[in-house]
Structure formats: structure tokens, C-alpha cells
């Protein structure tokens, strides 16, 4: 009901100005959704803060506002008579015919009443970001699916979204890995398919062990890094092959999860690192400390009480993550052709990186690399834990590979489906079972994560996420199938424009819940919390169930039949759209 809320807010402000033309204070109606259905649809609390400047009782002030409101024909066409409650709250109820008109407008509208923003400025969403030569593991799950969902919501709102994958494709680790492979398996550096990612990970572990224990190997590895940074063709070819091999494996995961990303790794920003230092120097922020060049943070002190530094060049002359992140921020906000021209940059990483980003963001702001009204945001998330409350691991104590986790989810979904089909005496072919199990399994993993407040840790449980009851993906997928089936049974019967008729309280509850969709999308866009959308979809399914259980639909008479079928269709469309914004595909049958 965003359009209605915006119209009401304008009408209230104008009424307050007419009622109190001499008040210098800001006239804010403080309009918000009503806390309880008996209070109407909205509540305006703006009379209370005016009591002191006007030296009047809030109820008298509310009465004057209501009187001015009722003189406005546009308000009279929108709302029933306002009610003053408590110390001076104004309760507002939207006219039933206006609510019915809003439902009618959303029927067949693919946007379901969600307005599009009018802006060409890019929004960058930086998410997933695995490391080359390492397999994606459960730790990449949250960044990947939270980032994808936020990107989908922002795109739906009409933003030009850059989905960037800031892969770890540069640094000392490549020097040691290339050196190790040259010595023990040179054939792996001839072509990208000479080694699979699992073997590459094993080689990486061997290289790391040698690097930690062998000073000669360490020195050779550092020489290899210098060659790589200097553009040595042999080193660059080896590096490119390693990146290609990892990239192919990452893409298999992304394709499976229906994730779209544009890779722009750390190496992309190499040409811009020197200018980061010169820019910080020009801004008079750069300080040399123990041979390292850094920026000391304001308001962030260490245990010794001294300001903490953000090091941008180490004492050995090398750059680090902070330098690369500063170069990325500068590039992303810079106008084309020098950058992306973004006005909002969102980083989706684990909460453990919060201090790092807080420091880097402060430096970027003090260097004036963030344009006026530019937004730089860190979207932190907690850990994925096992049911024992500890970090999710395999039985052997290793990190869970993301591929294995997804495989198990699909296998368990298939086992559940086959068991249910047997209990129901249904026979389905393997193609149907494979499709449904694949959809449900991946949906369950995504929804279990997205339905949690991302800031907290959450316990991973296949049993809970695959349950057909409760706030789960299988429950919502089944709700879509069921509701769409009810609508189909109604055939092509549709209510004529302007002829929707609702009389039962269960109908009005469903109408009001359906009309919240645009406000929920706006909230997710602003707060970057996908769990708000999950909570809404689950509540919508619950409200629909009460409506369908208590009010006849297919046996309804007169204009009630097409009107109630319209509610079924709009509910199915809203659930499908909402799940789609979470990256979850729906099914025709289960």
C-alpha cells in the first residue's frame, strides 16, 4: 500500500499546515501502519510532538488535524472517517472500494504494484568472492545467496545492478603454487583441463606446507610473484590457466544455484594501486610508520590507546587487501569512463570482516572518494553452524564443500519425495522426480539461509529445512502449487473491472496482506534484510489458509466467486514473485 501511504502522508502534511499555519516546527504526521486491525490501516502520531510548541492537549491538536483532513475531497475519497484514540493518535481506515481497486490494479500486473525507480546510476553488489585454486565451501553459501537475493530485489525495483565477483586471483599464494607446480607437476601448467580443482587444492596445500617450512622455496615463490607482477609471459600463462580451471568449477555451482555474476577479481585493480597511495598522499592522510605506509583511523584505538592504522603498503613494498579494496571503492564510484559511476556499493561478506570494512570505508570517505549522497554499505552475516551449535564441518573435521552440501540436499529431497509418493499411492516418472527433488532441495537450502536474520549465526538442519510444515521452502512451494490449482479449477472466470466484491473479514485480511507486498520490497531494498521478504511470504500463506478454510471459494455464489478466485490468483502470483526474488524456482506439481 505504498501509493496509498504516500498519498495519505501528503494529505496529512497539507492538513497540518492548514490547521497550524503559524507553527515554525517541522510538521511531520508520523504516519505508520496500524499496530492492530481494530485501529484501522494506518496511524498518525504527529499531534503528540506539537503539544509543547502549541501549548495544547494532543487530542485537541488531533481534532484540528482531522477537521482539516475532512475538508479535503481527496482524503474523503480515500479514507473512512478518522478516529482519535488514546492521547492523540489518529487512526485511519482505507475505504473498502479503494482497497478493492488496488487489488484489481495488481491482477495481471507482473510488477504487482511495485513501482520502478527512475535512476540510471549503478548499484554494485559485491558477493560470493571465492579464492582461485580453492573449492567453494559452506562459508561461501551465505554471501552467494544473500547477495543474489539482494541483487534480484534491487533489479526488480529498476536499479542497474552490477553483480561483481571479487575473486581472490592475485597475491603471494600464486607465487608459491606456480613454483610448486613447475617443480612437481609442470604438465599442469600447459592447459586448463590438465588438473581438476580437487587436485589443485591438494597441490595448494602441499605448496603452503613447503612455503611455511622451506626458506629456499619461500624465496623462489616470492621471485615468482615479482615475475607475475612484472608481466612475465610464462608466469602469466600459468596464472591464467589456474584461474580458468577454478572459474569453470565455480560456474558449475553458480549455474546450479541460478546465480549470475560478473567476475572482476583482485587482479583487475592492480593498475590502480599506485594511484591509491598518491590519492591518499594528496588528501594528506598517508603516514609512514615502521617502514609501512598507512592511514591512522579516527575514533578507533588499539589496546594501547593509540589510533589503529589501515596499512596500504607494507614495509617490504607490497600492497595488501586494504589497498585493493580502496582501489575497488574508488573505481566503483568514479564516473565513466574512469569507473562504474555507482551511487550505492554493497559488500556482502561475513561479520568477521566488519572491522576491516569499517576501516577501509572511513579511509575512502576521508579521501573524498565517496560522492555526495553515495552509499557505501557492508552487509555482514553470521556463521553456518551444525546442529551442535559449532561451525559446520564434515565428520573428519574438514570444511564442508558446497557441492557436497547441495548434493545431499537434493538426495534427501528425492528420498522424501519417493516416500511420499509411495504413501499416496502415486506413480511418477524419473524425470518428474528428478526435477521436483532438484528444485525442492536447492530451494530448501536457500530459504533456510535467507529466512534467518543474516546478522545472526544459524544452525543448518536438513530435517528442518526440508519439512513440509512451518516456515520452509517446501511448505511455500506446496502452497503455490495448491493455490494455483484452486485458481485453475475456477477456469477463465474473472471479475469485471471495478466489480470485485468482498464482504467477509477473512477476505479483507487477505486483501490487506496482499497489498503489503510493495512496502515489503521497499523495506528489503533499504534494509538489505531478505528475511523480511521470507516472513511476509510465510504470513501471506497463513492468511490465505485461514481465508480458504473459512470462506467458500469454488462453491461461492454470484460476484463472490470471481472475486475470491481473483484473490487466489493474486496470492499465487505474489508468492511466485516473492520466491523468485529469493532465487527460488516454483513448481506446477509436487
Curated annotation (Swiss-Prot):
Keywords for the protein's UniProt record, in alphabetical order: Aminoacyl-tRNA synthetase, ATP-binding, Cytoplasm, Ligase, Nucleotide-binding, Protein biosynthesis
Motif placement: 'HIGH' region: 130-140
Family: Belongs to the class-I aminoacyl-tRNA synthetase family.
Subcellular location: Cytoplasm
Residue runs in coiled coils: none
PROSITE patterns recorded: AA_TRNA_LIGASE_I
Molecular function GO terms recorded: arginine-tRNA ligase activity; ATP binding
Organism: Synechococcus sp. (strain CC9311)
EC number(s) per entry: 6.1.1.19
Assembly notes: Monomer.
Gene Ontology CC: cytoplasm
Name of this protein: Arginine--tRNA ligase
NCBIfam families assigned: argS
InterPro entries: aa-tRNA-synth_I_CS (IPR001412), Arg-tRNA-ligase (IPR001278), Arg-tRNA-synth_N (IPR005148), Arg-tRNA-synth_N_sf (IPR036695), ArgRS_core (IPR035684), DALR_anticod-bd (IPR008909), Rossmann-like_a/b/a_fold (IPR014729), tRNAsynth_Ia_anticodon-bd (IPR009080)
CDD domains linked to this entry: Anticodon_Ia_Arg (cd07956), ArgRS_core (cd00671)
Keyword field contains Metal-binding: no
Listed Pfam families: Arg_tRNA_synt_N (PF03485), DALR_1 (PF05746), tRNA-synt_1d (PF00750)
One BP term from GO: arginyl-tRNA aminoacylation
Enzyme class: ligase
Amino acid at each position: 500500500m505504498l501509493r496509498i501511504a504516500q498519498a495519505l502522508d501528503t494529505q496529512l502534511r497539507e492538513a497540518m499546515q492548514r490547521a497550524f499555519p503559524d507553527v515554525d516546527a517541522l510538521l511531520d504526521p508520523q504516519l505508520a501502519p496500524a499496530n492492530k486491525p481494530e485501529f484501522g490501516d494506518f496511524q498518525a502520531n504527529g499531534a503528540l510532538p506539537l503539544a509543547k510548541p502549541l501549548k495544547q492537549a494532543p487530542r485537541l491538536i488531533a481534532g484540528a488535524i482531522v477537521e482539516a483532513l475532512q475538508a479535503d475531497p481527496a482524503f474523503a475519497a480515500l479514507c473512512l472517517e478518522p478516529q482519535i484514540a488514546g492521547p492523540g493518535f489518529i487512526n485511519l481506515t482505507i475505504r473498502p472500494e479503494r482497497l478493492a481497486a488496488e487489488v484489481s490494479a495488481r491482477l495481471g500486473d507482473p510488477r504487482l504494484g511495485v513501482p520502478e525507480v527512475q535512476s540510471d546510476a549503478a548499484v554494485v553488489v559485491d558477493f560470493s568472492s571465492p579464492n582461485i585454486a580453492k573449492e567453494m565451501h559452506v562459508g561461501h553459501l551465505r554471501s552467494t545467496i544473500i547477495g543474489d537475493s539482494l541483487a534480484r530485489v534491487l533489479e526488480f525495483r529498476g536499479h542497474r545492478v552490477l553483480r561483481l565477483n571479487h575473486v581472490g586471483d592475485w597475491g603471494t599464494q600464486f607465487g608459491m603454487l606456480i613454483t610448486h607446480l613447475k617443480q612437481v607437476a609442470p604438465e599442469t601448467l600447459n592447459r586448463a583441463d590438465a588438473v581438476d580443482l580437487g587436485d589443485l587444492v591438494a597441490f595448494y596445500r602441499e605448496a603452503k606446507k613447503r612455503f611455511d617450512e622451506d626458506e629456499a622455496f619461500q624465496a623462489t615463490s616470492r621471485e615468482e610473484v615479482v615475475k607475475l607482477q612484472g608481466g612475465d609471459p610464462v608466469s602469466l600463462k600459468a596464472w591464467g590457466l589456474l584461474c580458468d580451471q577454478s572459474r569453470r568449477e565455480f560456474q558449475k555451482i553458480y549455474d546450479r544455484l541460478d546465480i549470475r555474476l560478473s567476475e572482476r577479481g583482485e587482479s583487475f585493480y592492480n593498475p590502480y594501486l599506485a594511484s591509491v597511495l598518491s590519492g591518499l598522499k594528496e588528501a594528506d592522510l598517508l603516514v609512514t610508520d615502521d617502514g609501512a605506509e598507512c592511514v591512522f583511523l579516527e575514533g578507533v584505538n588499539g589496546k594501547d590507546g593509540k589510533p589503529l592504522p589501515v596499512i596500504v603498503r607494507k614495509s617490504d613494498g607490497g600492497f595488501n587487501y586494504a589497498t585493493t579494496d580502496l582501489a575497488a571503492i574508488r573505481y566503483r564510484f568514479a564516473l565513466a569512463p574512469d569507473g562504474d559511476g555507482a551511487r550505492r556499493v554493497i559488500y556482502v561478506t561475513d561479520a568477521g570482516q566488519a572491522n576491516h570494512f569499517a576501516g577501509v570505508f572511513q579511509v575512502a570517505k576521508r579521501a573524498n572518494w565517496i560522492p555526495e549522497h553515495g552509499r557505501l554499505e557492508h552487509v555482514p552475516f553470521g556463521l553456518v553452524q551444525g546442529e551442535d551449535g559449532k561451525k559446520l564441518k564434515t565428520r573428519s573435521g574438514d570444511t564442508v564443500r558446497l557441492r557436497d552440501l547441495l548434493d545431499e540436499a537434493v538426495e534427501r529431497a528425492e528420498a522424501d519425495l519417493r516416500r511420499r509418493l509411495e504413501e499416496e499411492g502415486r506413480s511418477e516418472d524419473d524425470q518428474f522426480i528428478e526435477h521436483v527433488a532438484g528444485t525442492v532441495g536447492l530451494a530448501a537450502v536457500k530459504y533456510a539461509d535467507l529466512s534467518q536474520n543474516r546478522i545472526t549465526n544459524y544452525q543448518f538442519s536438513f530435517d528442518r529445512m526440508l519439512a513440509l510444515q512451518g516456515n520452509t521452502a517446501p511448505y511455500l512451494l506446496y502452497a503455490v502449487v495448491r493455490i494455483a490449482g484452486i485458481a485453475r479449477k475456477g477456469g477463465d472466470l474473472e471479475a469485471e473491472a471495478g466489480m470485485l466484491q468482498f464482504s467477509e473479514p477473512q477476505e479483507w485480511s487477505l486483501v490487506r496482506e496482499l497489498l503489503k507486498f510493495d512496502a515489503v520490497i521497499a523495506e528489503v531494498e533499504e534494509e538489505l534484510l531478505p528475511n523480511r521478504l521470507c516472513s511476509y511470504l510465510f504470513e501471506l500463506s497463513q492468511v490465505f489458509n485461514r481465508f480458504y478454510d473459512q470462506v467458500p471459494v469454488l462453491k461461492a455464489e454470484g460476484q463472490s466467486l470471481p472475486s475470491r478466485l481473483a484473490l487466489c490468483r493474486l496470492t499465487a502470483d505474489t508468492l511466485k514473485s516473492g520466491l523468485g526474488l529469493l532465487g527460488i524456482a516454483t513448481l506446477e506439481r509436487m
